[in-house]
């Protein structure tokens, strides 16, 4: 029994292990299938991403076909037809295409790079050849020039690139540059005080600070009582030289370690004076003034720098006992004496002077704004809108006749007021139109509502106030307001008044008016019959008979929905589209660029292949539209009307 139980347990464990292994294999196979599906999906995505199309005119049938573009690195070797797709071919050597295209020939690569330029990108099927200047040079006037080397005392302000030269700047105070370079910036002077040293020689724009050890804190060995120590940051070795003066009594020899661990700085000219000259031994009086009792002792420090210490004998004694002709002075104790007459540097004080000037300008602006606000408050509250309307009514009689006749259209000996025509048609919508034209407030609208009894009276008074309030009021603005509030019927009536082909009925032009201060003549109430209605009749002057209605661009806006009449100048020359209408469309298109391709697509069935080829050779879309106007305008009135309908359907802002 025990053996059978153990065997059953072993079989169960084996089955569990096999189940786990099987599950692991299934999971691995699923991951492998997912990875392969992603790999195979990538080229499909790439092929689906080629969504660009182009238009091609089949020369045999004359049809305009839409073909798929070829991918980058290829060109169209055969255009598509009704039964076949386009054929793409790889760009030959020396040519390339960067993007999807529908061209029949690849672009030629640029010429090989002239010396000393080097090639950054080679000529390939997808890229053009790109040439750059080698490192250390930049491109100037088509050639490579070396970067400028900043002289001593100047540092690099901006590093040079392949297209820009190095910019240098003079080292500011506290910095220096002792070597000419085209890459190094100005370095800061060594902080002697931070290293517990004294400044022996002040640095300039071309040299660094020279540091020395404080004599009060320096130490010497017992055998050499007078030692002056100097160091220079550019040398890794220094020499202990006996100075011409002895150190004060009481210096401890235990402080020598501090002397050895401190590195002082000395310029190269001072170091050359302190190094002994043992090359000439023949002349005892000329070359033995400075001697070394012992060879220089090399002492290695634990830091990265080490130095030699030269010990000079007292300069007052020679080797023979005679006095020396030259004496080397040791550095004095304490800090260097400051120059009482310091030079004024404008560059140092320029930042805070600029800030002070800006603050002064800001204060002046605030003071002026406060004074202006106080003057505005002293003027008192604004006048009541009703008083403004009364003044406007009084000024109406004083308005020049020329401004009043601007809104009157003379026809068959009758003067028809456009404002009265609009006021009789808009009804209660006059409030919205008036607010759109004048940006008027509710109080101003309420002033018209309380002063008149009928809507057409309020509308006429509001429109007259608009013409008085804004001298730039024009018929174009009025038409824009009517179209904004979907009153195209009123616009059609105005256009019919100005067109010679439409006759307005007398009952539509008769405006019922009640007597009011703003009415030029008493007119019966609306309840009176039609035969009692009258028109504003004004005999035109001889000059007004030859004057066009509205000198501005309002007339092309009114006539934009139809082609020119037979009496226009362009119609007599063979075009069915007026020059004013074409210029208005082209001017708007040039001011506000938009996609004109849908307009060209609508005209494809009207144009023949030769005309289509002429239009496609024009690079600019605006010039293409201009040429399209010229071609379509001489075909027929139906073709001209089709072009205008397409223009105003795709460019609604022109309406």
UniProtKB/Swiss-Prot annotation:
Subcellular location: Cell membrane
Annotated signal peptide: 1-41
TNFR-Cys repeat residue intervals: 50-88, 90-131, 133-167, 170-211
Membrane topology of this protein: Single-pass type I membrane protein
TM stretches of this protein: 350-370
PTM comment, free text: Oxidized in response to reactive oxygen species (ROS), leading to endocytosis.
Keyword Disulfide bond in record: yes
PROSITE patterns in the record: DEATH_DOMAIN, TNFR_NGFR_1, TNFR_NGFR_2
Domain Death: 415-498
Residue intervals on the Extracellular side: 42-349
Pfam families, per the entry: Death (PF00531), TNFR_c6 (PF00020)
Biased composition (Low complexity): 216-225
GO biological process, one term: negative regulation of interleukin-5 production
Subunit structure: Associates with TRADD. Interacts with NGFR. Interacts with CASP8.
Xref: PANTHER family: TUMOR NECROSIS FACTOR RECEPTOR SUPERFAMILY MEMBER 21
Name by which UniProt lists this protein: Tumor necrosis factor receptor superfamily member 21
Natural source organism: Rattus norvegicus (Rat)
The organism's taxonomic lineage, starting at the top: Eukaryota, Metazoa, Chordata, Craniata, Vertebrata
